[in-house]
Amino acid sequence: MQVPAVLGEPIRFVLNWGRRYSLWVFNFGLACCAIEFIATSMSRHDFMRLGVIPFAHGPRQADLMVVSGTVTDKMAPAIKRLYDQMPEPKYVISFGACSNCGGPYWDSYSVTKGVDQLIPVDVYVPGCPPRPEALLHGILRLQEKIAAEGAGVGGVSRPDALASPTGGAAPRSADSLTAPLVRPPTPS
């Protein structure tokens, strides 16, 4: 069922306005960037004034997942599972060099070269670790993106380039990232 064009634009505006100013955040903090996330949520920077509510009880109550820190291949299935538990529409901010591209550990055998290999990322915040102001800037960019979204039936669908068969490379499955156990050689 399509919303008539006359009603569609005002409804889309209201839905996107509500989404953009009531983001419940689920922080997946893995390293020092998580400390900067906590600093951003404190009273000095106060991202609640932007409509961002920190510390959702879990992924099922969250709209926004902030992945901060080094993502290892062993942690990848947990990130993928938590992302899948989030209700639509869901957004992801990759916060810091480690979650963007592996950071200083990019050449390690066990480090995923960016969280975007696992889940679609909406905003990248660079830095090692990024300052709280950088996260605030990333949230503002995400809110601009939400305001420009088209809403589908029920107002929750959005095009996802990584999920579509024609757009971009598909993210790796979490199962492909689980390495077999490494056993020490047996003495002979």
Curated annotation (Swiss-Prot):
It is a peripheral membrane protein. Binds 1 [4Fe-4S] cluster. GO terms for molecular function: 4 iron, 4 sulfur cluster binding; iron ion binding; NADH dehydrogenase (ubiquinone) activity; NADH:ubiquinone reductase (non-electrogenic) activity; quinone binding. It comes from the Bacteria. Its EC number is 7.1.1.-. InterPro entries: NADH_UbQ_OxRdtase-like_20kDa (IPR006137), NADH_UQ_OxRdtase_20Kd_su (IPR006138). One of its GO terms (cellular component) is respiratory chain complex I. It catalyses: a quinone + NADH + 5 H(+)(in) = a quinol + NAD(+) + 4 H(+)(out). Belongs to the complex I 20 kDa subunit family. NDH-1 shuttles electrons from NADH, via FMN and iron-sulfur (Fe-S) centers, to quinones in the respiratory chain. The immediate electron acceptor for the enzyme in this species is believed to be a menaquinone. Couples the redox reaction to proton translocation (for every two electrons transferred, four hydrogen ions are translocated across the cytoplasmic membrane), and thus conserves the redox energy in a proton gradient. PANTHER family: NADH DEHYDROGENASE, NADH-QUINONE OXIDOREDUCTASE SUBUNIT B 2. This is NADH-quinone oxidoreductase subunit B 1. The lineage of its organism: Bacteria, Bacillati, Actinomycetota, Actinomycetes, Micromonosporales. The gene is nuoB1.
